[in-house]
Amino acid sequence: ERDLADVCMVGRSLLCDPDFVNKIKNGQEDDIRPCIGCLGCLSSTMLKDHVECGINPSLTSENEETVTPATISQNILVIGGGPAGLEAAYILSKRGHKVTLAERHHTLGGAMIVAGYPIAKQHFAQTTKYFIKRVIDCNIKIELNTIVDQAYLSQHHYDHIIVATGAKPLRLDIFK
């Protein structure tokens, strides 16, 4: 009411998204990169000489405002629509490349979708929505339900291919 505050504290959210406050002020809440509470920032400050963030890979290097434009725009295929594939497609697009993102399932997000199901893990779902929104906003060609095999590759030409198909879960065979 009086434009005063007793206490205002924002910590990890500013590491995830340095423009956090400006985006709230401008009504761009959907554009905020959400913190997942992994505490990578805390452990990195204790164990390393710099701060790292599990969701913001550009915290210690390039960021969205300093992405170097490519000298030559190339046609690039990113295989896999999980977090790594979404980030790769986004950065490549920002650099000026023509990007196709191929995902074998009917939706993007990869393992982050399942990670967001348990109670108190909804921040993973928010993060997945954020990554997907960025890719959609960049007009990246998205091909869902697409298997990239020899037949697919023979019908398309790409200068480079990035494989970001994720890890396989470790299954313990102790309960046979």
Language model features: what each stretch is:
Residues 1, 134, 154-155:
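Structural alpha-helical scaffold elements that stabilize or flank donor/cofactor-binding regions
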Residues 21, 132, 150-153:
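Short amphipathic alpha-helical segments and helix-helix/interface helices
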Residues 1-79, 83, 87-99, 107, ...:
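Flavin-dependent oxidoreductase catalytic cores
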Residues 78-141, 170:
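Beta1-alpha1 glycine-rich phosphate/pyrophosphate-binding loop at the start
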